[in-house]
Amino acid sequence: MGFWKFPPFLVLSILVLYQAGMFHAAPFRSVFDGRFDPATLDEEESRLLLAAMVNDYEQMRTRESEKAQKTEGSRIQKRACNTATCMTHRLAGWLSRSGSMVRSNLLPTKMGFKIFSGPRRNFWF
């Protein structure tokens, strides 16, 4: 039974060692070296690099503008109030806001609370 487990392990070990040998044959320095020398590029490679950079820049700007449009479109924009119904609602809102201000600022303090919340008398018999 243990014999059947051994060949896959052996094949896997040989494959790993073979790949490790291939990596040692390739120079690590050129891959991990942080310096980039544009003089080593020929004209076609430099054009491809420039096109890729421009494409990435355009995609970045497109994403930024789409994000700005999404946030701008989510704001509530008020329409112009030209109809009679709209003007009536607007005037009623203004009067209700100013009514509380008038009540609190212009009524004498002796009258305010007791008059508006006193006992209600029903004169309908």
Curated annotation (Swiss-Prot):
Keywords for the protein's UniProt record, in alphabetical order: Cleavage on pair of basic residues, Disulfide bond, Receptor, Secreted, Signal
Propeptide position ranges: 26-77
GO molecular function, one term: hormone activity
UniProt main location, coarse: secreted
Example of a GO cellular component annotation carried by this entry: extracellular space
Signal peptide per UniProt: 1-25
Subcellular location: Secreted
Keyword field contains Nucleotide-binding: no
Secreted in keyword set: yes
Alphabetical GO biological process terms: adenylate cyclase-activating G protein-coupled receptor signaling pathway; regulation of cytosolic calcium ion concentration
Xref: InterPro entries: Calcitonin-like, Calcitonin/adrenomedullin, Calcitonin_CS, Calcitonin_gene-rel_peptide, Calcitonin_peptide-like
Domain of life of the native organism: Eukaryota
Family per similarity comment: Belongs to the calcitonin family.
Summary of the function given for this chain in its UniProt record: Stimulates cAMP production via the calcitonin receptor (CT) but not via the CT-like (CL) receptor.
Name listed for the protein in its UniProt record: Calcitonin receptor-stimulating peptide 1
Organism: Ovis aries (Sheep)
